[in-house]
Amino acid sequence: MGQSGAPTLVIRIDDLGALHSVNEACIQTYRSGIARSVEVMPVAAWYPEAIKMLKENPGLDVGLHLVITSEWENVKWRPLTHCPSLTDENGYFYPMMFPNPAYPGQSIMEQKWDIKEIEQESARR
């Protein structure tokens, strides 16, 4: 609630780094005064451009977007480190978290992921 007691709308920008067009839209949304915070995706292809844009817009609050799925067909994400228990045969994250009968074997929960491997990979960073 705002100071007047009226509800307050908070808008958070999402997926910075995903695509060039997403980066442009995120920064435009911030510069237009619509939002003041963004989530950046370090695993995304346009992450380097996103970092450059963030440096040019120091007033933008930044958070990390945790990515462990890669649901789009033509845009894929993969881990920053070697973590094969979370990836498919091509090294990309699985497209969904939970099983879907229409897409057998395509969820993380159907795989034999190794928490020790994940912990070791995260400790390297």
Task: Name every feature range the model reports, one short phrase each.
Residues 2-21, 25-26:
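Boundary/entry segment of secreted carbohydrate-active catalytic domains
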Residues 8-10, 35-37, 59-65:
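Structural preference for beta-strand elements that scaffold enzyme active sites
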Residues 14-16, 41-43, 65-71:
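Active-site beta-loop-alpha junctions enriched in small/polar residues
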Residues 20-45:
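A short alpha/beta connector and helix-capping loop motif
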Residues 26-32, 47-61, 79-88:
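Acidic (Asp/Glu)-rich catalytic clusters
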Residues 36-37, 110-113:
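The substrate-binding groove and active-site-proximal loops of carbohydrate-active enzymes
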Residues 75-111:
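Active-site gating loops and adjacent loop-to-helix segments of metal-dependent hydrolytic enzymes
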Residues 116-125:
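CE4/NodB-like, metal-dependent polysaccharide N-deacetylase domain
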